[in-house]
C-alpha cells in the first residue's frame, strides 16, 4: 500500500495545531521532529544520538502525516490545505513549508525506530524499546515498548511529565483511568507502581498496540484496555484520572470528571502547549477544580488538579 507523506515545517509553537489537523483527517501515523527536544536528550546524557551528527536548532519542527493514496486522498488533501490556510490567517508566522511524497507503508511504519533508544525518566523508570538490549539497575522499573503507530514512547515532554508525576502520585491498589492511552505507556507505568488501570482510546490501532504492550510487560492482570469514549466504556469512579491528549480535548473531558473521579481524586492533564495552559486552568476552575501543581518542560505543560471543597 502506498501512502502520501505530507511534511509541514512549522514553528515549534504550532506543532500541536498542525498535528491535530492530521489527526482530524484520520491519519494513522503522525510524527513530530523537534530539534530542540532532540538536543535536550543529547544534553541529558540519557540517549545516544552520536550517529545523527550535529543538531541544528532552528526554532522549527517538522510535522509529518501519512494519508492513504486511495479515492479519499484528494478530498483529504483539500481539507488539509483549508486547515493550513486557516492557521496561516490566525498565525502567519507558523506554517513555513509544505512538502509531499509517496512512500511505502513499511518505510514510514518502521523508520522511526532508529530514533527510539532506551531512556531514563524520573527516578526509576527505564523505557526500553522491545528490540533493544539494556543492562538495568536493581531499582529500575522497566517499561518495554513497541509503540508501532500509536502515540507514546515516553520521550516527548508531555509523556515524560506524566511519568514523573505518576511516580510521585500513584499508590498501591489505586484505581486509575487512562484516557487516550496511545501506546499504553502511562497505564503500564501506573500498573508497575501497583495501580489497577482502565485504559481507553478511540483509535482501534492504539488499542491493539496498547494491549500488545500490556502483555509484553506482563501486567494484563492489572490493566484493561478498551476502545471507546469515557461516556460509553468507563463505569464507576477513579482515584486518579490521566489525560495526555491536547488542550481542546481536555477541555471537552473536564465536564465529565464529576462522574468518573472520586471526591478525593486527582486529575493529571498533559499534552498542553504552553500558550493554552491558561485556557485549561480556566476550564478546570469553572467546573470546581483547583490546580495543585503546574509543571513545564520544553514548552509543554502538565496540570495536577483536584476538587475544591466547596464544589463537592
Swiss-Prot record:
Annotated NCBIfam families: prmA
Keyword Protease belongs to the record: no
Keyword Methyltransferase recorded: yes
GO molecular function, one term: protein-lysine N-methyltransferase activity
Protein name listed in UniProt: Ribosomal protein L11 methyltransferase
GO biological process, one term: methylation
Pfam families on file: PrmA
Residue positions binding S-adenosyl-L-methionine: 159, 180, 201, 244
Gene3D superfamilies: Vaccinia Virus protein VP39
Described function: Methylates ribosomal protein L11.
InterPro entries hit by this protein: Ribosomal_L11_MeTrfase_PrmA, Ribosomal_PrmA_MeTrfase, SAM-dependent_MTases_sf
Species, as recorded: Desulfitobacterium hafniense (strain Y51)
Reaction(s) the record says it catalyses: L-lysyl-[protein] + 3 S-adenosyl-L-methionine = N(6),N(6),N(6)-trimethyl-L-lysyl-[protein] + 3 S-adenosyl-L-homocysteine + 3 H(+)
Major localization listed first in the record, in broad terms: cytoplasm
Enzyme class per UniProt: transferase
Gene that encodes the chain: prmA
Similarity comment text for this entry: Belongs to the methyltransferase superfamily. PrmA family.
Amino acid at each position: 500500500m502506498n501512502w502520501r507523506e505530507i511534511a509541514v515545517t512549522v514553528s515549534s509553537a504550532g506543532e500541536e495545531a498542525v498535528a491535530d489537523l492530521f489527526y482530524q483527517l484520520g491519519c494513522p501515523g503522525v510524527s513530530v521532529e523537534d530539534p530542540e527536544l532532540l538536543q535536550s536528550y543529547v544534553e541529558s546524557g540519557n540517549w545516544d544520538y552520536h550517529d545523527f551528527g550535529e543538531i541544528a536548532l532552528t526554532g522549527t519542527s517538522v510535522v509529518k502525516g501519512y494519508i492513504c493514496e486511495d479515492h479519499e486522498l484528494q478530498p483529504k488533501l483539500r481539507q488539509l490545505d483549508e486547515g493550513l490556510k486557516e492557521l496561516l490567517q490566525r498565525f502567519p508566522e507558523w506554517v513555513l513549508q509544505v512538502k509531499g511524497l509517496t512512500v511505502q507503508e513499511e518505510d514510514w511504519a518502521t523508520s522511526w525506530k532508529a530514533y527510539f533508544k532506551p531512556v531514563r525518566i524520573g527516578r526509576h523508570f527505564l523505557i526500553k524499546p522491545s528490540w533493544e538490549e539494556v543492562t538495568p539497575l536493581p531499582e529500575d522499573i522497566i517499561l518495554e515498548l513497541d509503540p508501532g503507530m500509536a502515540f507514546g514512547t515516553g520521550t516527548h515532554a508531555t509523556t515524560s511529565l506524566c511519568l514523573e508525576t505518576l511516580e510521585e502520585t500513584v499508590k498501591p491498589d489505586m484505581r486509575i483511568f487512562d484516557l487516550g492511552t496511545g501506546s499504553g505507556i502511562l497505564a503500564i507505568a501506573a500498573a508497575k507502581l501497583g495501580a489497577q488501570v482502565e485504559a481507553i482510546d478511540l483509535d482501534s490501532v492504539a488499542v491493539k498496540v496498547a494491549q500488545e504492550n500490556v502483555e509484553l510487560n506482563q501486567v494484563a492482570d492489572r490493566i484493561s484496555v478498551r476502545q471507546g469514549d469515557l461516556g460509553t466504556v468507563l463505569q464507576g469512579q477513579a482515584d486518579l484520572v490521566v489525560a495526555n491528549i491536547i488542550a481542546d480535548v481536555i477541555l471537552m473531558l473536564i465536564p465529565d470528571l464529576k462522574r468518573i473521579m472520586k471526591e478525593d481524586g486527582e486529575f493529571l492533564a498533559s499534552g498542553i502547549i504552553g500558550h493554552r495552559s491558561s485556557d485549561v486552568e480556566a476550564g478546570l476552575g469553572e467546573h470546581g477544580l483547583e490546580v495543585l501543581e503546574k509543571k513545564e518542560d520544553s514548552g509543554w505543560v502538565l496540570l495536577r488538579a483536584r476538587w475544591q471543597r466547596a464544589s463537592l
